[in-house]
Amino acid sequence: MCIRDRYSPASINFCPYERRYFTERNAGKIDAVRNQISLWHEGGLIGPSENCLLVADLLEAASGIANIAGTYGCFLKKWTQQSQGELAIKERDLMPQCVVHKMSVGDVFDIKVEQHDVVYLDPPYTKRQYASYYHIPETIAYHDEPSVEGVAGLRPWKHNASPFCYKSKALQAIYDCVNGLSADRIYLSYSSQGHVELSELVNCLAGLGGVRLHSLGEIGRYRPNRVAASKEAVVEEYLIEVDKAPGD
């Protein structure tokens, strides 16, 4: 009962905090579904692909009834209308034919690419650490029972902290990432909301090859609360093209 006991009002029975990420009913359903998927997988009734598919469907369904403002950094004090709905797992539309592709999960600094590959990078722009902002989906996916702490009930995450999210480390991290990739052509997505000034970033990457800056225009700024809503309403999105091929 990991989700129910940690992330619903039932948490008050186990810690000083009444967490409201999910209603007790929905949290119990999440636990039940996740346990059943695990039993099917361990019993050989489904394979690794089916296991991943069903867990992904559960994560999507859980997000649909979570009492949050976009991420799981913390729960909302008052219940939203969305959170009062019932957990519902929808059938996913699958492609009728197999598509040959390859995916990997790991540290971007460890990714191996070929010179002829084209790489697209979309690093975090701000201080928001994904490891902490999405801790509950991590717990559902791993199906473990970590020790959690604080009002938000965070699982241990600092070992997964991203250097891109620290203002003092972001520029060097981006440079090291681009420099370490063997691909000749690299595209980097960045924002005016980011830690690094755009001109500073472009000048830094210019030492690796030809750099072209493409403006993608303005988008609405994410505003989860009144404080954020009072700030600048839009941000500029950019695509930085780095061509490392000799002579280009």
Give a label for each model feature.
Residues 198-204, 208-247:
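Class I S-adenosyl-L-methionine
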Residues 102-104, 214:
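General small-molecule cofactor/ligand-binding pocket signal
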Residues 105-110:
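Conserved SAM/SAH-binding loop
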Residues 163-209, 216:
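Conserved Class I SAM-dependent methyltransferase catalytic core
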Residues 115-119, 149-162, 234, 245:
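Mobile, glycine- and charge-enriched loop segments
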Residues 5, 113-133, 189:
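Conserved proline-anchored active-site loop of SAM-dependent methyltransferases
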Residues 4-95, 127, 131, 135-167, ...:
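Class I S-adenosyl-L-methionine-dependent methyltransferase module
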